[in-house]
Every structure is written in structure tokens, then in C-alpha cells.
């Protein structure tokens, strides 16, 4: 026996509910604690799936993957994002599926990069770039390739890819997220090249733009880069900056930002304030283990064996 047909009014209500769920999820991902996005986006996926709205399912799934990754739930993020690749890679893929396949490849690359797997990340960024038909998607992959090169110590490649990414956002002042991320990578490249002053300038610009965009997670990451640059420059403000980064990251429950901010702060305070140093290092270890808990076994072992991570447990 077939179900009763859905009325026009019910259909409109469902569409409004779906739009609200997507907007709520996107707002939390980029302007609040990312964990607050998860429930709304899971409901959006279910509602869109019931209605056969594949584009909305894909958009919500990508946002869900970003939210999970931002909180350090990398295993969950990869589980959500990986199925979005293949549908966008077929020859007759719809433009929106191709777009989200490219964005998902860049997001998967970011997960691997955060785990220190820069060569793997480069493969996914290249895969995403091959699919990129829009400036937005191409930017994410180009900037990812620059960050991959930083992690691999390839300063010339990093700068070249960064400049290509910069060309894609030239004159697009409304693209706050892309511009903030570009300044992060500018700071990373400057640090790789040993130019702490340039890194401070880039990180400060990222913080200012993120604050103006009401994007606290992006503020926290900008503060992390700023604090590291200040350490390299011998700036006494580094301790204050890193405390701000760590405290904000903890309030957002963004473990990928908590652990490096706490680790650097703990090392910095080892002589001047051993008690705070110990607390900070303990918080870094807790965040590292929180990330490890959501990883597949082989990746977990690799993560915990990473030199800067392993050093936390040897101290």
C-alpha cells in the first residue's frame, strides 16, 4: 500500500527545514563550536536523502566532514568525506557533485596534513585540483599544495603554490575564509624561510580578518601561528598569545588547535613557570590522545609515533 502523497505545503515545509538545518550547520562550522554543527547536518543529510535531493546530501556531508575534522574526529571525517570523491570523478558528473568532490579531496588532504602525512595530503590535493572547475575549489587545493610543501620542507614549491592560490582570490574581499587561510600559509612559508617578522605580519592579518568575520576557530588558529612566529622572533608577547590561542581553542573543543598551542606554551614556560608548563603539557597530551581515539589503528600508531607528538610523552 502506497503512502499518502506529500502536499505542496508539506513539501515547502520540508524544504524550509532543510535550508534551516544547512544554514545552522554552516554557521556553527565557520562561526561557532564545530561540534554544534554535527546534529543539524546529520538531520539535514537524512531529510535530503528521504527527498532524493542528492546535491543537498552532498553539501551537508561535506560540511559534516569539515565539522568533524575541526574537532579532531579525523576518523569520522574521513568516513564521511571519502564517499564524496568517486561520484564527482565520473565523466558525466553533475557540476555540484564535481565541486564537492574537489572540496572533499582538499578536506581529506587537510586531515592527513594535520596528522603529519604531507605526502598523502599532496596526493589528495592534486586529485582535488584535477576536479576543480571553480576558483573556490581550485583555491582550496592550491593552498593545500602550498601547505603540503611547507610540511615537506620545500620552500620554493610552497611559495609558488601559495602565489597561485593568491591569484585566485585577488579582488575578492568577501572571501574572508580563503583570505584568512591564505595568511596562515603566508605565515607558515615565512617561518619556513626564517622570516619571523613576515610571519608575524601575516598571522596578525589573519587574526584581524577572522575577528572581523566573527570566526573564533579561525581566530584561534591565527593566534597559534602568531604565537609560534613570536617565539621565533624572541618576542615576549608569545606567551600571552599562545595562552589566548589555547584558551579559545579549548572553549571551542578544537583538539587540533589545542594540542600544538598547549605543547608550545608548555615548552616555553618550562623554566619560568614549571607548574603552568606541566599543566599545559598535560592538556596537550590529553588532546593528542583524544585525536588518537578516533583514528584507525595503523594511522593511530603513526600519529603517536610522530616525533613532535611522541616527544610530549617522553618529557
Summary of predicted features, one role per range:
Residues 1-39, 43, 240, 244-315:
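C-terminal non-catalytic interaction modules
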Residues 31, 51, 71, 115, ...:
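Structural motif corresponding to the intra-repeat A-B loop/turn of tetratricopeptide repeats
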Amino acid at each position: 500500500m502506497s503512502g499518502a502523497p506529500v502536499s505542496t505545503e508539506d513539501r515547502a515545509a520540508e524544504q524550509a527545514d532543510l535550508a534551516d538545518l544547512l544554514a545552522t550547520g554552516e554557521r556553527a562550522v565557520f562561526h561557532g563550536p564545530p561540534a554544534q554543527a554535527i546534529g543539524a547536518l546529520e538531520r539535514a543529510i537524512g531529510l535530503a536523502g528521504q527527498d532524493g535531493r542528492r546535491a543537498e546530501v552532498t553539501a551537508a556531508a561535506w560540511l559534516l566532514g569539515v565539522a568533524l575534522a575541526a574537532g579532531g574526529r579525523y576518523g569520522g571525517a574521513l568516513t564521511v568525506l571519502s564517499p564524496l570523491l568517486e561520484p564527482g570523478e565520473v565523466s558525466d558528473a553533475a557540476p555540484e557533485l564535481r565541486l564537492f568532490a574537489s572540496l572533499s579531496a582538499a578536506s581529506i588532504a587537510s586531515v592527513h596534513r594535520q596528522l603529519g602525512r604531507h605526502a598523502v595530503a599532496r596526493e589528495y590535493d592534486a586529485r582535488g585540483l584535477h576536479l576543480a572547475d571553480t576558483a573556490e575549489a581550485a583555491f582550496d587545493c592550491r593552498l593545500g599544495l602550498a601547505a603540503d610543501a611547507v610540511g615537506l620542507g620545500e620552500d620554493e614549491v610552497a611559495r609558488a603554490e601559495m602565489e597561485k592560490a593568491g591569484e585566485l582570490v585577488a579582488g575578492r574581499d568577501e572571501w574572508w575564509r580563503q583570505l584568512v587561510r591564505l595568511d596562515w600559509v603566508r605565515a607558515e612559508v615565512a617561518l619556513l624561510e626564517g622570516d619571523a617578522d613576515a610571519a608575524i605580519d601575516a598571522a596578525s592579518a589573519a587574526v584581524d580578518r577572522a575577528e572581523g568575520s566573527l570566526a573564533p576557530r579561525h581566530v584561534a588558529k591565527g593566534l597559534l601561528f602568531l604565537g609560534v612566529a613570536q617565539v621565533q622572533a624572541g618576542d615576549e608577547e608569545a606567551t600571552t598569545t599562545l595562552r589566548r590561542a589555547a584558551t579559545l581553542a579549548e572553549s571551542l573543543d578544537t583538539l587540533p588547535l589545542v594540542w600544538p598551542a598547549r605543547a608550545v606554551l608548555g615548552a616555553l614556560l618550562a623554566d619560568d613557570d614549571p607548574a603552568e608548563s606541566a599543566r599545559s603539557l598535560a592538556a596537550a597530551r590529553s588532546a593528542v590522545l583524544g585525536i588518537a581515539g578516533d583514528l584507525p589503528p595503523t594511522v593511530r600508531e603513526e600519529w603517536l609515533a610522530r616525533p613532535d607528538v611522541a616527544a610530549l610523552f617522553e618529557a
